[in-house]
């Protein structure tokens, strides 16, 4: 049968689409599709992009990925893909894919910080990397090195990084880019529930009556989930309600029954308005039994700062930055804050001194009466006036929308799901606003129930599965454990077979502080893995200069030359998703594994291999002796204890951490891997010359399986249970905790969660035990020294409205919001290499209200400068596009390195979660 490529593509697409929706496929189309797929091998895998976790089928032929389609058997996406998902194959074969290590060298071929990039061998790359690491490590100790990790690590990669950096090098300066996207959600989960990650699952979409999005443009950022929302809405348009709360109109508004455009930061006030409506005007709606049996009321300090440098006159600040920087020490209360902080005895014009009482867990129990008192100012009139974000909308219209919003939550029999992503997380009070969502759902008893719950959606494919569950944050260990807790360190040392006292008890530098420490000379070696920190971090002009400081050495492991690679000193070419084994964990706690489909391109190698090879270059005697952390802490010499465990000071970290006797018991030849590549285990046909200059022939044991089986010991029996390695390769993922082979759909609900049943506290049990001992007090402060244990209960927090540190002014009159677009992923490092996606959206635009553009004398598509106190970028204006901003606000996506918008953004963070607020700063815009 002969037919054209065009005919084949049409028939294959038709067959796939028909299969996805359950239609029968015409025999001719099916025959054409099968003919075109001769010699293809299909295997299940996972999409490389967002946190939805779509299952895909990957086809290989002649050692190349030749096609990708949605997996009809995958429960998340049911055969559908979004526009990015369909191009999973093409991200791997961009024209400028990195294929060899690149080092800055002089004319003699020697490393030179001011030299140009030239290809070098893996041996040369690791020789220089080792020397530079040891220089920083020997001079500054474990605090002198840092690793930018990722929510795009595979689970095994993240676990290996945590074990190497924290267990091997005894440094906690490992922090993922998930700090930028999920840290506020994490902090709120831990403070509220005592355990991380959502209670519900995606099935809530089909089971609910109401979907309310808060700072979540799901139509573009989680399009497959939005397809499910759309299907639910259209199934019963009159009953099912969709509400979109945002600071600008976006595609999610197209389906919404109500669109609420609010002023940046005032989501804090809107949540409190809803709670006030419940408590003051509809007390009958409170689920008193749920609240009494399963919750307590709590609050915390407000003088927590804004997560900027505490040295407000830091030498590296530009003079233009100083007025905003000063708010880290104190601020004058605005008129709005004079109302919302009245319960503290403060008024507008008072000066609040920032005492930085922002440690997670620094809160206390209050009475319901105090909680009610604190909500009193958040009347409909006050909140509507404060929060109305569209000056062209009448106040009465906005008030009517807020009332309808509250009524939907309050309606007794109505099921409600609240979804949010970066709009709430990237927020200088991100932890607070996350906690407010639970406040409302708890009051109504609409949490941890099928079809009802507050649901934080993850942005990255394994921000949950790796960054959070594995513990690649600077303060965490696997399974919600933390470095500061001696019991948690003891558990980790036992599983990792480390001498007692090896692990560093002091929290490391978080993502933003790794940048600041590079600028200050406190960190002199940084390794970038699976992300692009120099493009994704606010106030970027500072960090570009820091990277090029002569004393700093930057290593970037990447597949393409993004901004971070360009400012680095050494670039390591890295295998991409289907060129390695791995696993991701998505937003509904679903863990999914895949097999390596093809060998990496050129001489690129997997991150697991890179870390393993680097670990070979360090002997125990170099890293496990006494190590000074600061003036108060010196880590003990554990070499004698290591000897007692059978280790030698001459042993390498590779031998102890990754190639020990247990690891070697995982046989190289495994039925799961039969017929598939496994570069780390066997090497591959490329015969890559490895870090020792010899052809790499593999480790001879199944390192990925070993890493998985060791890792899951941390969570089993503790509410984080995972299945064994083989099981995941037979299923389309499982939602943890996986107990007796069964996944858990709704946590904390005894009907569905075996841990909740085991607790024996009734229908619900919020069994997380972190931060569950707290004092009692009033709205001002704790009043008891004694701490009271909280068992199987969650916390209902009161958190007030406070202004962000930077707001529009006469000089910088516009709000700036940043974010993503449907067609591109994060910094565009992968998707900008896909011709179809590049042609669809070739550049980042400055979305602006037509009247704002008219005032500036700017027409559609004309170039403007977007300038803040920190920097400026040039972009073309769009007044008609997908993102329709209100007067006074502009939106610029960050995927385009030529429109380097993070030069403009403020590096303020939530002081509790340390997550950067990319959603609000002040700018001026003028014609270029």
UniProtKB/Swiss-Prot annotation:
Binds 1 [4Fe-4S] cluster. Binds 1 molybdenum-bis(molybdopterin guanine dinucleotide) (Mo-bis-MGD) cofactor per subunit. CDD domains: MopB_CT_Nitrate-R-NapA-like, MopB_Nitrate-R-NapA-like. Residues 40-96 form the 4Fe-4S Mo/W bis-MGD-type domain. Pfam families: Molybdop_Fe4S4 (PF04879), Molybdopterin (PF00384), Molydop_binding (PF01568). It catalyses: 2 Fe(II)-[cytochrome] + nitrate + 2 H(+) = 2 Fe(III)-[cytochrome] + nitrite + H2O. [4Fe-4S] cluster binds at residues 47, 50, 54, 82. Component of the periplasmic nitrate reductase NapAB complex composed of NapA and NapB. This is Periplasmic nitrate reductase. It comes from Wolinella succinogenes (strain ATCC 29543 / DSM 1740 / CCUG 13145 / JCM 31913 / LMG 7466 / NCTC 11488 / FDC 602W).
